[in-house]
């Protein structure tokens, strides 16, 4: 006879137990270790500091659970042990973090997962129970983000940053601002308006506690964002290249394509007409070579062939215009760089401006030749108006580098070496990561490697530096290469993600949006294992999942079946 049979009180506690599930598992493990025929349950309860009524209830519940559970006894004992409770807690936390918070899985589907896995015999899978877990985790995610933002900001080194800004609609207005190098979200919140004052307020709240200076804002040409950047932040406005190219596509692509399709239809019509006349001509000649209609038919065939040739030439002209327009549009992206992507040589703002102007001139010429509508020409004019800002962005890039080099107090040869070799090499590396094709990525990486090899020649300046000095200069060169930001694609991509989540959930609350921001900044990792927060603050944050394990409530037990009355 074991000790629990000597317990005099067999009733369950009527009050809700203040004991955590893991603590109960620890006490039951202590009981199993001390249990013997020579010691009573009351004595064991005193030794492990648990009321004897409570201990008896725990033991009886565990034994009933072991008898009624469909899992093997050893598996059930494991899940009832402290380590088993920890495992269940880890599974529930991971499931909610990955399935519910990050990937929009419904709570009923999550309960289904627990049912199919058999874990519903150890954890409560009801909608209400899992809703409580989801709400608690959402609150914890927001709390973690706030605490880590404050903690990491204290030790963050001061620096200048770029912001990419844009709005999206759910249909509520959602303002989004991201630091593009780290991909860290600074602003992501719903607001009733999207004017400059609203942008100023949102950015000021976030930037107030950070040792950063916004020196550049990349976005579309929204007047509110431009005013916010130039007036409130005192930053340079860098136009987003995508919107410039988008205007040129709207102006030329569809119109020229429709003319090509029309020319193709005319050519097919002319070919059918020519073929029909040839059939009549051949049929008439077959009937009689002296047919007086043959000369007339021959003239008709000749005129049809001439018309077909002219139509074919018109089609070639339309196709050539399309190809030239596409090349000009692509040329805007190819040449809008402070470094020549073919040679790796630095380019001045005037050189870049001249190249870009040539592409705009080509598009204007094609519009005139094709007789495009006034609306199309207005679109081209709108895109061309951004040329000055694009050229100014190149000048801003080199001005910022000059200011950095002056602040670092480098010698003239070292400054020249950084400008001509090291900075362009690292810029080409970044351009290679964003190239459209594998062939272009390989070419740019190869060119960057060649320039880096030249810059690191032991016979040059590189050979005169210590290893620490070499690492420091390479870090400085990478910082300089990051100054040029011509695209707000990081924000556009984030807006697309939010649209998909809004479509799945039908509504994104302010709290849910905050939780998603924290997941983006502190959970999503790149291939090197770094998070956006680590790249932005320059220090590793606490592990989000481990923090959730420490703060999220342990999973509740499933409700026991009610006794029949």
Where are these regions (language model features)?
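Mobile genetic element proteins and their domesticated derivatives, centered on retroelements
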Residues: 27-30, 55-58, 110, 166, ...
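Conserved small-residue motifs centered on glycine
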Residues: 340-343, 347-451
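Flexible coil/turn residues that form the inter-helical turn or adjacent wing/linker of helix-turn-helix
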Residues: 36-37, 103
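Charged alpha-helix within mobile-element recombinases
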Residues: 268-303, 316, 320-323, 327-330, ...
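Basic, short loop/linker segments at the boundary and entry of helix-turn-helix/winged-helix-like folds
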Residues: 9-29, 53-100, 128, 158-159
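RNase H-like nuclease fold core
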Residues: 79-243, 248-345, 351-359
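C-terminal domain-tail junction helix/linker
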Residues: 420, 424-435, 439-468, 473-488, ...
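Short alpha-helical "recognition helix" segments of helix-turn-helix
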Residues: 40-48, 110
């Amino acid at each position: 006879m074991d000790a629990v049979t000597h317990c005099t009180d067999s009733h369950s506690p009527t009050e809700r137990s203040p004991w955590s599930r893991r603590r109960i598992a620890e006490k039951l493990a202590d009981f199993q270790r001390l249990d013997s025929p020579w010691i009573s349950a009351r004595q064991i309860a005193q030794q492990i500091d648990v009321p004897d009524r409570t201990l008896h209830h725990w033991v009886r519940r565990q034994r009933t659970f072991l008898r009624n559970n469909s899992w093997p006894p050893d598996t059930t004992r494991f899940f009832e042990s402290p380590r088993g409770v920890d495992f269940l807690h880890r599974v529930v936390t991971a499931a909610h973090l990955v399935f519910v918070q990050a990937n929009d899985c419904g709570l009923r589907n999550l309960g289904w997962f627990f049912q199919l896995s058999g874990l519903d015999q150890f954890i409560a899978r009801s909608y209400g129970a899992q809703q409580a877990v989801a709400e608690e985790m959402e609150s914890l995610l927001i709390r973690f983000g706030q605490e880590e933002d404050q903690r990491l900001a204290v030790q963050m080194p001061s620096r200048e940053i770029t912001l990419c800004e844009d709005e999206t609609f759910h249909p509520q207005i959602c303002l989004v601002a991201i630091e593009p190098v780290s991909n860290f979200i600074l602003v992501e919140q719903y607001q009733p308006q999207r004017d400059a004052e609203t942008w100023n307020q949102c950015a000021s709240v976030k930037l107030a506690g950070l040792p950063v200076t916004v020196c550049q804002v990349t976005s579309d040409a929204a007047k509110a964002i431009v005013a916010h950047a130039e007036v409130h932040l005192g930053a340079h406005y860098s136009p987003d290249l995508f919107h410039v190219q988008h205007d040129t596509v709207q102006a030329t692509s569809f119109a020229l394509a429709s003319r090509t399709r029309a020319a193709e239809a005319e050519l097919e019509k002319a070919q059918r007409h020519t073929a029909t006349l040839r059939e009549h001509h051949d049929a008439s000649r077959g009937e009689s070579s002296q047919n007086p209609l043959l000369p007339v038919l021959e003239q008709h065939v000749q005129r049809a062939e001439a018309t077909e040739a002219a139509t074919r030439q018109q089609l070639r002209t339309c196709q050539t215009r399309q190809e030239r327009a596409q090349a000009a549009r692509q040329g805007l992206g190819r040449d809008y760089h402070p470094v020549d992507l073919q040679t790796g040589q630095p380019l001045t703002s005037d050189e870049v401006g001249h190249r870009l102007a040539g592409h705009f001139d080509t598009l204007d010429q094609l519009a005139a030749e094709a007789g495009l509508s006034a609306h199309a020409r207005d679109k081209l004019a709108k895109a061309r108006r951004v040329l000055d800002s694009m050229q100014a962005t190149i000048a801003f890039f080199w001005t910022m580098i000059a200011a950095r080099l002056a602040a670092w107090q480098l010698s003239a040869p070292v400054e020249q070496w950084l400008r001509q070799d090291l900075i362009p090499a690292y810029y080409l590396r970044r351009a290679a990561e964003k190239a459209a094709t594998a062939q272009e990525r390989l070419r740019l990486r190869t060119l960057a490697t060649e320039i880096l090899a030249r810059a690191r020649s032991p016979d040059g300046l590189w050979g005169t530096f210590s290893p620490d000095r070499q690492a420091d200069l390479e870090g400085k060169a990478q910082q300089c290469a990051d100054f040029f930001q011509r695209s707000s694609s990081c924000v556009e991509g984030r807006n697309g993600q939010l649209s998909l989540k809004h479509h799945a959930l039908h509504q994104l609350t302010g709290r849910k949006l905050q939780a998603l921001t924290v997941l983006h900044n502190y959970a999503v990792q790149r291939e090197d294992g770094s998070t956006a927060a680590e790249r932005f603050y320059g220090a590793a944050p606490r592990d989000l999942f481990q923090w959730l394990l420490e703060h999220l409530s342990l999973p509740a037990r499933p409700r026991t079946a009610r006794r029949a009355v």
